[in-house]
Swiss-Prot record:
It comes from the Archaea. PANTHER family: UPF0175 PROTEIN SSL1255. Pfam families: UPF0175. Belongs to the UPF0175 family. This is UPF0175 protein AF_0100. It comes from Archaeoglobus fulgidus (strain ATCC 49558 / DSM 4304 / JCM 9628 / NBRC 100126 / VC-16).
Length: 93
C-alpha cells in the first residue's frame, strides 16, 4: 500500500498547526516498537545523531548503540552532537 499521501497529509497539518506535531509525537510514542523503528530509520538516513536517537527513546547512548548493533546497523562516526554528549558525560564523572 502506497501511503505517501498520509505522510504528505501529516506534513500539511503540522505546517498549518505546529502544535499538532506534539500530539502526533505523543501518539507515536505510545507504540514503542513503531517509534523505535522510526527513530532507527531516521538514524540510518543520517537525519539524527546517535545522541538524538537515544534521547528520543529515553535510553542511554550505550543502550542505543547496542540496539543498533543487534539489528546489524553500523554506527556512524561521531558528529558534533555526539562529541558534546561524550564530553558532558565525562564531566559528570
Amino acid at each position: 500500500m502506497n501511503a505517501i499521501w498520509i505522510v504528505k497529509g501529516i506534513e500539511n497539518v503540522v505546517k498549518s498547526n505546529p502544535k499538532r506535531l506534539e500530539e502526533l509525537l505523543a501518539n507515536l510514542r505510545r507504540d514503542k516498537e513503531l517509534f523505535e523503528e522510526i527513530v532507527i530509520s531516521a538514524y540510518v538516513e543520517g537525519l539524527i545523531s546517535l545522541s538524538k536517537a537515544s534521547e528520543l527513546l529515553e535510553i542511554t547512548r550505550d543502550e542505543m548503540a547496542e540496539i543498533l548493533r543487534k539489528r546489524g546497523v553500523p554506527l556512524r562516526n561521531l558528529n558534533k552532537d555526539d562529541l558534546v554528549a561524550e564530553v558532558e558525560a565525562i564531566k559528570w564523572f
